[in-house]
Amino acid sequence: MAVTIFFSAFMCVVIYFFGLAGSMNSPFALIYAAFMLFLFVRMLSTKNWSRYRSVFQTTLAVLFMISFIGILYDERGSMSITGTQFQNAETPFCHIVIPAMLIPLAITKTVIFPARMIGHFASVVSMLLIWFIVSVTIGRGWCSWVCFYGGWEEGVSRIPKKAKIKVLSRNKDLRAFQFAFLFFIALVSLGTLSSVYCEWFCPFKLTTEYAQITDIPTLIATVIFIGLFLGLVIVMPYLTRKRFQCSTLCPFGAFQSLCEKASAIGIRIDVDSCTQCMKCAEACKFCAIDIDTIKDKKGKPEITCAKCGECITACPQKAIDFAYKPSVIGRIA
């Protein structure tokens, strides 16, 4: 019951921030927020985390894209952004660059993503604040409950009933690659004092804004964006039923995993009730449950768990559930 109440309060904040902030007088925003709240209430009442959370996040992604593109056309008449507009901080702050931004900010006092610092619901300060709140509450749960980009993979991964390619045996390798990529992005961003991920690797440029193509490097970057979107957001989630981009290329997701010890809520596996059927491992969208996780009776998923609840729904023994982390709650108290 306590976890349910906590989730309800938390999601009300999320729905307000992404659905209503800055547009309280918009009928569309009110309808959108009401629909999202309805989905969340249905999820709590039925305990069907799998179905309603998926619809919730997919809807969040699609409507965010529509709203964001509409704002871009109202403000500058195009989805493309020029170098001058970017340097003048005429773009919202993107949470994905947070891990690459923190080290240069701490060492050189340089903000490598030139967004508005304050005075906007998606300014640097407001996004860092919401990130901090999420980190100490649900940690990497951001990826499955809050991220308006991850909904694209979520929706695509739901289309096939069964995975055409099984990657369970490669879970450890995929996790290792994601952390290695995070280290690479952080190191190069510090060395160049630029948002390398945003400039070269972000597949979601197709759903938000992209750099105006004026030279060969920008053209090459655009081709990379398209390839990554098609490959990691569309094709691989469809073939594997996994959140593939989230599990391999997203630096923010990897960074949230490293911050996981600070979060108050996690997933608990009752090892006494578990029959080791591996249905939870097959259902996990983030490659966070291995054969060894179950065989070794660890009692919880691996560090990349995004608390999506897929394992809870999949478990026939009802041996998995959300739970407060006693160690974290004890430190807070």
Predicted segments with their positions:
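Non-ligating segments of multi-cofactor redox enzymes
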Residues: 1-282, 287-294, 303, 313, ...
